[in-house]
Each structure stands twice: as C-alpha cells, then as structure tokens.
Amino acid sequence: LVWLVAKNKEEIIKDVSIDDDAIKGDPDAPVTIVEFSDYQCPFCATFYKNILPQIQEQYIDTGIAKLVYRDFPLGGHAHAQKAAEASECAGEQGKFWEYHDILFENQDDWETVGTGKFKEYAGTLELDSETFDACLDGGEMADEVRADFLAGRNYGVTGTPYFFIDGRPLSGAQPFSEFSALIDKCVEGGDSCLIDL
C-alpha cells in the first residue's frame, strides 16, 4: 500500500477535465481542485465535515483555489448513484452546492432509504418538486453521473474521495496539512506543484 501511494504521487495528469461540473469559488482562481466523490462514502463525509471548511476558508474564499465536484458513485453503495443524480437535478435548478451539503450533512438519514429522502431534501431547498421529481425519476442525470465516473476511472481513480490539485493526485480524506502543502506549492507558480513534496 505504501508503494502504491508513493507511486501515485508521481502520476501527474496535467489536464484533468472539469467537464461542466459544479464549481465552488472563483472560476478563474489559479489553483483547481477536482474532487471525485461518493455521497454515501463515510470518508467523503469526513472530508466534507472536517477538511473542506478549512480549504474553503483559507483557499476558496480568498480566491486562491476553486473546487470542482465530480461524481464517483461506488457500486457497493446502494443509493450513491441516485444521490449523485439528485444533486445534479438540484443543480439544474441552481442549487447544486446546497443539495451537496444537505446530502453529506444527513448521510446517516438517507443511506438506507434513498429516493424518498432525496425528494424531501428538494422540498427543504424549495426546488420545483415536479421538475425535480421528473428529473430524478426519469434518470435524466444518469448519463452525466456515469460520464464523471468513467472520467475518474480513466484518470486512475479507484476509491473516494480522490482529488487532483492542478493535476496532482491526492487520495483519501487526508489531513488539511496535506492539501495545504500541495496547494501552497501550486500557488508558487510554474511547475512547483508538480514536484514531490
């Protein structure tokens, strides 16, 4: 495992696509963090609750970095695919991040029941329920979610959460210091963030 992590750090993908996925922060921020995540993954929830707030405060809110969320629902999580579709349906009504947040904040509540809760959350966010239900029930975002998943596979993503910081992979809900060290290197400019830390 140690060898795989070390090897992974050397595999740099300079052009990780952000597709048309949701962006948190200034779209023109100099550093791009692409997150491949699964709403039902407990480690993804840990990242959301414990690490993302620090990244948000220090890098996103200050215009240094932007976060792009891409779906990577794992097969072992029964409701992950539909949760991802639900967030994309909410995004169609301009509330992707609000829905993203409600899914992670309430992961324990919906992970065994799924769709009924997804519709309830849409109501909580005052989304147009008819439009949301049609989107979710009709699988309108299934291809979008699948495209993210396949892109992640092509980039070597095997689990969640998985990040690319200006193309540099970082796997798992790492401590904030790991993100900070890599982002700071990228802020220095040029290829500095492509060098081993």
Task: Locate each region found by the language model.
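C-terminal cap of thioredoxin/glutaredoxin-like
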Residues: 1-3, 36-38, 48-52, 57, ...
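Short, internal strand/loop/helix patches
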Residues: 87-107, 114, 128
